[in-house]
């Protein structure tokens, strides 16, 4: 083989090897789709629509929001998991969808640690222990005493058995040494109505929509927030951890991509979202919606997912035996 031919073949090989890296560096060259497992108009959907324009500007391509509700998020999860691992399809998830639902709905066949790669954390929202005013308690310690004196008599609202609120409340009961009865409802509007009417007396949930107004006018009472320290989202409400050390029920919302998405693509996506979340005006809008901006990169998010799966595993196992 002559020298010219050898050089030509060597150049062709080098070009072939360089193509994947070149394609990654050019990412994105078409719109990026965010699959949302919730209906349009909800809090998560509203947050993404706030991020849509600044993230698209950062990436240099439009960001498309694709709402795919149903099956407790598993329809959207499967769609995203089966997408090409090229960064053009990402899935928005929360703590329940990434650390609870796949292990409760095993028939869905979605192993989040195997099927997804973390992109970034977007926001956090703490769970708050709410009670109807008819419950004769003024604080969390009194509530625990009352619940222990009335085992199985207090009913709490959940959006479906095995959902985040159900599992988080199970962990709360286990740590507190109390026993309450779950009452499942179809959605957040129904659980809120049940708590306001006194149909149920308790709910551990994140605050959204008009819930803060109900707190202010006394239609419901907040006994504790499930964070390590006080939360700016619910000022004046003491941490549950003051009474139950270590109790944490904060809902994190983040983005994941199909497994095997190139790290450089994950980093570029994550940077675009975390940069957008640094805008003070946007952070203020999120706070008004009951969320705090919590921009964390993919590595930190991956570590959090592992911790969350481990934390909820005991409660999920108990649900399986009921």
PLM regions with names:
Residues 79-88, 95, 103-186, 190, ...:
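Hinge/capping helix and adjacent helix->loop/strand transition within the periplasmic-binding protein
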Residues 7-18:
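Bacterial N-terminal signal peptides
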Residues 9, 30, 53, 58, ...:
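Short hydrophobic alpha-helices and adjacent helix-cap/hinge residues
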Residues 96-106, 171-175, 202-235:
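A ligand-binding cleft/hinge motif common to bilobed small-molecule-binding domains
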Residues 29-31, 174-175, 216, 263-322:
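An extracytoplasmic/periplasmic, membrane-proximal ligand-sensing/linker region
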Residues 1-6:
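Positively charged n-region of N-terminal signal peptides that target proteins for export
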Residues 43, 47, 51, 76, ...:
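Hydrophobic alpha-helical segments typical of transmembrane helices
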């Amino acid at each position: 083989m002559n020298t010219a031919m050898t050089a030509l073949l060597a150049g062709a090989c080098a070009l072939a090897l360089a193509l994947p890296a070149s394609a990654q560096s050019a990412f994105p060259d078409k719109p990026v789709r965010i699959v949302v497992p919730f209906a349009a108009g909800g809090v998560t959907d509203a947050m993404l629509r706030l991020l849509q324009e600044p993230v698209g500007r950062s990436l240099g391509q439009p960001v498309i929001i694709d709402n795919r509700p149903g099956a407790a998020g598993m329809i959207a999860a499967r769609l995203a998991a089966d997408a090409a691992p090229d960064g053009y399809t990402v899935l928005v998830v929360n703590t329940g969808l990434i650390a609870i639902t796949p292990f409760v709905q095993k028939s869905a066949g979605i192993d989040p640690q195997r099927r997804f790669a973390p992109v970034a954390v977007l926001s956090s929202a703490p769970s708050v222990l709410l009670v109807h005013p008819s419950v004769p308690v003024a604080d969390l310690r009194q509530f625990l005493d009352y619940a222990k004196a009335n085992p199985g008599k207090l009913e709490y609202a959940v959006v479906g058995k095995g959902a985040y609120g159900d599992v988080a409340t199970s962990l709360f009961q286990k740590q507190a040494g109390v026993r309450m009865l779950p009452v499942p409802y179809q959605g957040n509007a129904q659980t809120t109505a049940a708590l306001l009417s006194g149909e149920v007396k308790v709910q551990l949930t994140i605050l959204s929509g008009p819930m803060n107004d109900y707190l202010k006018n006394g239609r419901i009472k907040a006994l504790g927030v499930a964070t390590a320290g006080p939360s700016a989202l619910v000022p004046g409400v003491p941490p549950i951890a003051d009474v139950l050390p270590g109790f944490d029920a904060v809902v994190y919302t983040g983005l994941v991509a199909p497994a095997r998405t190139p790290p450089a693509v994950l980093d570029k996506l994550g940077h675009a979202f975390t940069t957008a979340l640094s805008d003070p005006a946007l952070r203020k809008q999120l706070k008004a919606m009951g969320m705090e901006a919590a921009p964390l990169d993919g590595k930190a998010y991956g570590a959090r997912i592992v911790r969350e799966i481990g934390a909820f595993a005991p409660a999920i196992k108990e649900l399986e035996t009921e």
